[in-house]
């Protein structure tokens, strides 16, 4: 596996997150949920933080922790995971992800999740754009399409 990175690309609600957690647990790798990272970005933008400061804010004030139920997100030690899972945050993330500035800012952050012990990254363009040298898995929402 090149660079010890496994990426799982696919559309929303195709099982990427569950597959990524299971593979990461099995291999002992770190995990990156890029959709959650986009939600954090949208959440911070909605809190009034400008694009130019969001990456720095994420690096300084946001902590990602894995547990049995998935990834927990802390902002200055306050759990904001439930806020990030709200439909309104998902819609905001979808809108903001269409902006080139957002995608460019997040690409460096996403690449920063790499760990020498390995990484499983899930998202719509993880293997095609963010980690092009990774082992790529593609999921489909329909078992027939896989």
Describe these PLM feature segments.
Residues 8:
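Hydrophobic anchor at the beta1->P-loop junction of P-loop NTPases
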Residues 14:
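ATP-binding Walker
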Residues 17:
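Walker A/P-loop
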Residues 26-32:
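Post-Walker A helix-loop "phosphate-sensing" segment adjacent to the P-loop in P-loop NTPases
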Residues 36-119, 128-130:
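ATP-dependent small-molecule kinase phosphotransfer cores
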């Amino acid at each position: 596996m090149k660079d010890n990175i496994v990426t799982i690309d696919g559309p929303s609600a195709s099982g990427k997150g569950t597959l990524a957690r299971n593979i990461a647990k099995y291999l002992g790798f770190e995990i990156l949920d890029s959709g959650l990272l986009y939600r954090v970005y949208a959440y911070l933008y909605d809190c009034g933080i400008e694009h130019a400061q969001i990456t720095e804010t994420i690096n300084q004030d946001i902590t990602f922790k894995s547990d049995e139920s998935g990834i927990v997100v802390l902002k200055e030690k306050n759990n904001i995971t439930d806020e990030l899972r709200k439909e309104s945050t998902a819609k905001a993330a979808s809108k903001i992800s269409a902006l080139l500035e957002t995608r460019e800012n997040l690409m460096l952050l996403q690449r920063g999740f790499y760990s020498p012990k390995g990484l499983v990254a899930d998202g719509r363009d993880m293997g095609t754009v963010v980690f092009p040298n990774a082992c790529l898995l593609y999921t489909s929402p329909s078992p027939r399409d896989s």
